[in-house]
Swiss-Prot record:
A lipid is attached at residue 225 (GPI-anchor amidated alanine). It is a lipid-anchor; GPI-anchor. This is Ly6/PLAUR domain-containing protein 5. The gene is LYPD5. It comes from Homo sapiens. Keywords: Cell membrane, Glycoprotein, GPI-anchor, Lipoprotein, Membrane, Signal.
C-alpha cells in the first residue's frame, strides 16, 4: 500500500502542472478573411482559441490606387519572431499598407476591427493632375477577376505614365492568397512595397507605355523567389556548421 503513495503524489503533481499550464494560456480571437472593400468586424461574434504566449492581429492591404483594394485580415496566436522592422518603399506602386499588433491579455486582439485602421490608398491628387495615360485597372484573387471585361478604364494620375499588370501573393503569417492586378504605374515600374517579418506582398509583372496597353492575359503562374532561395535561418546555419565542426574537433 505504501509503495503506491509516491505514484499518487507524482500523478497529483503532474495534474497540477497541467492545470497551471492551462491557466497560463491566453484566450485570443481567431479570424482570417479576404475583403474587396470596406470591412467592419465589430458586430461579429469571433471565435477564440488558446495561445501559449501572445495574441496577434494584422491587416495587409493592396490597392490599385483607383478605389479597388484587396485586404487580408488575420487574428490568432502570435507566430514568427517576437520583434522586427517594417520596411517600405515610397516610390513603389501599387500602393499597399500593413499593420501588425501583438498583446498579452485575454482577447486583446480586438483593436484592428474596421477599415478605418487603413489609410486611404486611393488618394486622388489635389489639385487633380492627370498624366495623359489611360490604363486598365482591376484587382482580385482569381485570374478571372482581372479579365479585360471586368477591368475598368482609368485616367492615370500625375507621373504615372505607364501601365502595369502582374500577379503575386499576399501573406499574413501563415495565411496567404494569390493576387492579380492591372493599374497605372511610373516608368520605373518599382513594385517592392511594404514588408515585415509577419507580412509580405510579392509581385511580379511588367510595365508598358501606350493606350490601354496592359491588356495581356493573366496566365503566367507566379513563382516566389522564396521557393528557390533557402530561408535566411538555413543559410546562416549552413555557414556556421563548418565552424561548429572545427570547434568540436579541436576540443
Amino acid at each position: 500500500m505504501a509503495m503506491g503513495v509516491p505514484r499518487v503524489i507524482l500523478l497529483c503533481l503532474f495534474g497540477a502542472a497541467l492545470c497551471l499550464t492551462g491557466s497560463q494560456a491566453l484566450q485570443c480571437y481567431s479570424f482570417e478573411h479576404t475583403y474587396f472593400g470596406p470591412f467592419d468586424l465589430r458586430a461579429m461574434k469571433l471565435p477564440s482559441i488558446s495561445c501559449p504566449h501572445e495574441c496577434f492581429e494584422a491587416i495587409l492591404s493592396l490597392d490599385t490606387g483607383y478605389r479597388a483594394p484587396v485586404t487580408l485580415v488575420r487574428k490568432g496566436c502570435w507566430t514568427g519572431p517576437p520583434a522586427g522592422q517594417t520596411q517600405s518603399n515610397a516610390d513603389a506602386l501599387p500602393p499597399d499598407y500593413s499593420v501588425v499588433r501583438g498583446c498579452t491579455t485575454d482577447k486583446c486582439n480586438a483593436h484592428l476591427m474596421t477599415h478605418d485602421a487603413l489609410p486611404n490608398l486611393s488618394q486622388a491628387p489635389d489639385p487633380p493632375t492627370l498624366s495623359g495615360a489611360e490604363c486598365y485597372a482591376c484587382i482580385g484573387v482569381h485570374q478571372d477577376d482581372c479579365a479585360i471585361g471586368r477591368s475598368r478604364r482609368v485616367q492615370c494620375h500625375q507621373d504615372q505614365t505607364a501601365c502595369f499588370q502582374g500577379n503575386g501573393r499576399m501573406t499574413v503569417g501563415n495565411f496567404s492568397v494569390p493576387v492579380y492586378i492591372r493599374t497605372c504605374h511610373r516608368p520605373s515600374c518599382t513594385t517592392e512595397g511594404t514588408t515585415s517579418p509577419w507580412t509580405a506582398i510579392d509581385l511580379q509583372g511588367s510595365c508598358c507605355e501606350g493606350y490601354l496597353c496592359n491588356r495581356k492575359s493573366m496566365t503566367q503562374p507566379f513563382t516566389s523567389a522564396s521557393a528557390t532561395t533557402p530561408p535566411r535561418a538555413l543559410q546562416v546555419l549552413a555557414l556556421l556548421l563548418p565552424v561548429l565542426l572545427l570547434v568540436g574537433l579541436s576540443a
